[in-house]
Structure formats: structure tokens, C-alpha cells
């Protein structure tokens, strides 16, 4: 099985699992249908499964057209009335089998109130939608900042070699903010230089080990990150207070 990012809109990735022997394709968060249809038809594949992380249109907008094209396609997603056409509603603690893959469902509210992620422990793969980005994290929409903080603490506990398949290409801009927070962090500086030199614009998947060294939202216990937060209005150096300031500062960062 092969995993590929299929680009959608300006910076979305629809992660696709391709099994050419079986002639099937599975995908995560198809915000657009056309890129998936083109890819499937050009590679003579049938869409078997759709995995959804949350209700935002750039993640679910292609579902209607895709299930019209492939009526037998299974659609997994969180229990949320804002998401239509989910054939298999799922929640924390359940598992989903996609071919030979067995995903554990993680409840990760914060970005939205019902956000979930798909974690495959045998492969070490995490499909985290808009909860975690490389060097960053999602904004808070209809979830809470406390929930988002807890969701990222959960990710910190995953094995360090876990590959992180985020839904957007935000890495370079996130690294610029990370450098503002920790100007002396050599991991941030070196990684920024690395991706500026690479020929491909795609910086994903990341991994938990890398994120623990470059992502300020996973580094709220580090002294320089705490000092940045305190100098920008944090009430204390408590992890949640630091996290709140980081998210607020990132919201207006240019």
C-alpha cells in the first residue's frame, strides 16, 4: 500500500491510500472531489473508503460527488449533524478497518467540538486533520482552547516515530512563528533552511519526534517558550496559560 498527498484548493492535502493490487483507493478529508476522481480514473482505481476528521467544508466538500461516483464507498466520520452522508459514525475508543489497516479513533476536540483523528499503531501513522500541523496547530473554531491543549498533550504521548499526516501545507509559515518564539532553537532554524532548499513544496508527513523539537505548541514546558508567553501577557508559566498566549499570538502573526 502506498500513501500519497493529493493537493486540493490552495494548501489542502487529501491523503490517499493506494492498493494497486486490489485496485482500490481510500482517502482522508476529500474537500474536493475532482482531484480524487481524476486520480482514481487515471490509475484505474475504485474509491473504497472515506475517512473524515471534522465538518469544515474544505475537508468534506467532495463527499457528495464522490459517493455519487462510487455508491458503495464507506464514509466514516465523527457523530456530527453538520456532516452529511456518513455511513459509519464513529467515536473515541472505536476502531476502523480499512483493508489491512486498523485505525484507532482518537477524540481531539478544540479546532472543532467533534474533531477526531485516525491512528494506526502498527504502521505508526496519525491522520490528525486540523488539530496538529507541522510546527503549529489548528485555530479554535467551535471547540475550546482547553480542549485543543488537551488534544495536543495526547499527541505528545504517542511514540516518537509516529508519522504525522496533517491536512494543510502550513509548515514554513509556522516555522517563522516558531522562530519568533524560540529564536535560539537550532532545530527550528535548521529545519527551516532544509525545507527552503528542498525541490518539493510538500513537507509532510512530519513525525512526533521532529514536532517535539520545533513545534512551540508542543513545547509549552520549555523555558524560552514560557518566557515568550510571559512577555506577551500570560498569567503564569502553566502549560495552558502558555498555550493560550501562543495561540492568540499566532492568530495575528504575519
Curated annotation (Swiss-Prot):
Query: Would you kindly state one Gene Ontology biological process term found in this protein's UniProt entry?
Result: methylglyoxal catabolic process to D-lactate via S-lactoyl-glutathione
Positions that bind Zn(2+) 1: 54, 56, 111, 130
EC number(s)?
A: 3.1.2.6
Q: Recite the UniProt keywords alphabetically.
A: Hydrolase, Metal-binding, Zinc
Catalyzed reactions: an S-(2-hydroxyacyl)glutathione + H2O = a 2-hydroxy carboxylate + glutathione + H(+)
Under Pfam families, the record lists:
HAGH_C, Lactamase_B
Which chain regions cross the lipid bilayer? none
- Pathway assignment: Secondary metabolite metabolism; methylglyoxal degradation; (R)-lactate from methylglyoxal: step 2/2
| Co-factor note (free text) | Binds 2 Zn(2+) ions per subunit.
Q: How does it assemble?
A: Monomer.
Function, as annotated, reads: Thiolesterase that catalyzes the hydrolysis of S-D-lactoyl-glutathione to form glutathione and D-lactic acid.
Q: What is this protein called?
A: Hydroxyacylglutathione hydrolase
Q: Which organism is it from?
A: Legionella pneumophila (strain Corby)
Amino acid at each position: 500500500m502506498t500513501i500519497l498527498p493529493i493537493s486540493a484548493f490552495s494548501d489542502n492535502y487529501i491523503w490517499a491510500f493506494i492498493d494497486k493490487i486490489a485496485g482500490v483507493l481510500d482517502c482522508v478529508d476529500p474537500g474536493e472531489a475532482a482531484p480524487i476522481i481524476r486520480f482514481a480514473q487515471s490509475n484505474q482505481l475504485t474509491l473504497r473508503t472515506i475517512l473524515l476528521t471534522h465538518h469544515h467544508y474544505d475537508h468534506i466538500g467532495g463527499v457528495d460527488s464522490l459517493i455519487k461516483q462510487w455508491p458503495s464507498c464507506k464514509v466514516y466520520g465523527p457523530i456530527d449533524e453538520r456532516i452529511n452522508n456518513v455511513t459509519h459514525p464513529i467515536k473515541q475508543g472505536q476502531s476502523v478497518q480499512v483493508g489491512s489497516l486498523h485505525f484507532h479513533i482518537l477524540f481531539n476536540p478544540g479546532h472543532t467540538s467533534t474533531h477526531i483523528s485516525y491512528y494506526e499503531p502498527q504502521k505508526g501513522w496519525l491522520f490528525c486533520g486540523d488539530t496538529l500541523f507541522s510546527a503549529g496547530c489548528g485555530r479554535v473554531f467551535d471547540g475550546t482552547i482547553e480542549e485543543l491543549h488537551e488534544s495536543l498533550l495526547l499527541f505528545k504521548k504517542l511514540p516518537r516515530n509516529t508519522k504525522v499526516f496533517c491536512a494543510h501545507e502550513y509548515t514554513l509559515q509556522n516555522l517563522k512563528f516558531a522562530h519568533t518564539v524560540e529564536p535560539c532553537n537550532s532545530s527550528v532554524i535548521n529545519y527551516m533552511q532544509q525545507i527552503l532548499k528542498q525541490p518539493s513544496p510538500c513537507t509532510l508527513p512530519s513525525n512526533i519526534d521532529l514536532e517535539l523539537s520545533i513545534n512551540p505548541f508542543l513545547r509549552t514546558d520549555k523555558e524560552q517558550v514560557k518566557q515568550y508567553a510571559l512577555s506577551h501577557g500570560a498569567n503564569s508559566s502553566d502549560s495552558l496559560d502558555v498555550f493560550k498566549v501562543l495561540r492568540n499570538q499566532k492568530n495575528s502573526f504575519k
